[in-house]
């Protein structure tokens, strides 16, 4: 349908449909058909699961997938260019865009796994222990790394959009070789997985992490206010 639900997940359905020239009823029917295509086991409500489980799922399902598939598709492009350098005029530009996105995604996933996801898990652990202090947040607000990740998501989505345009929607010409057809199918699959990956983070994980941090910081702010009041009282001042 071409609706951007990963980086554009906050857009109202009516507005998104209008941009694509679609009716809401047609989109809802397509969503219902899509739901039937998934097994019950895959229909997990990630708005209800723990943030720890969600971050684990993103790493084991989506990060692992990208690390497995990105090198293979890159090698396939190089092989096609070596064997058929003149057959696919846009393939060199596609390869260059793909390699740049691949490099950015590798760094992006590492930052999530080393910095952001442990931060989110630590906040959830602090919530369970019910013993939060200002020392629980030595890296500042979770908003800082989230904003960086969101910008990098936008860049990845833009790269996918450009690659889709360059390949006419990841379509193969009638006379395309089997390797090129496999490449287009692989890019379509990778695009779908990355869109879902970004959706889980932008529209579920990140907003929930921000709300969790806000709830944890409220008692910390109250403690600071109480200490300030006690300090003023000790010196005979008002609050």
Question: What residue ranges belong to the model's regions?
Answer:
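Small-residue-biased structural context
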Residues: 1-239
């Amino acid at each position: 349908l071409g609706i951007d639900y990963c980086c554009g997940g906050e857009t109202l359905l009516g507005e998104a449909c209008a941009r694509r020239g679609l009716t809401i009823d047609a989109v809802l029917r397509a969503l219902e058909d899509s739901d039937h295509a998934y097994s019950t086991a895959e229909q997990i409500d990630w708005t209800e699961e723990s943030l720890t489980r969600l971050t684990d799922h993103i790493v084991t399902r989506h990060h692992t997938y990208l690390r497995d598939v990105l090198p293979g598709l890159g090698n396939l492009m190089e092989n096609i260019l070596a064997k058929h350098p003149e057959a696919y005029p846009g393939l060199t530009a596609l390869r260059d865009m793909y390699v740049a996105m691949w490099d950015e995604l590798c760094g992006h996933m590492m930052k999530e796994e080393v910095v952001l996801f442990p931060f989110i898990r630590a906040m959830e652990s602090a919530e369970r222990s019910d013993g939060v202090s200002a020392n629980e947040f030595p890296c500042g607000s979770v908003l800082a790394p989230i904003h960086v990740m969101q910008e990098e998501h936008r860049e990845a989505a833009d790269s996918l959009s450009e690659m889709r345009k360059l390949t006419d929607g990841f379509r193969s010409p009638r006379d395309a070789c089997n390797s090129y057809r496999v490449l287009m199918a692989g890019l379509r699959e990778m695009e779908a997985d990355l869109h879902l990956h970004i959706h889980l983070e932008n529209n579920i994980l990140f907003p929930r992490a921000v709300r969790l941090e806000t709830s944890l910081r409220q008692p910390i702010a109250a403690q600071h206010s109480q200490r300030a009041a006690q300090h003023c009282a000790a010196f005979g001042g008002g609050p």
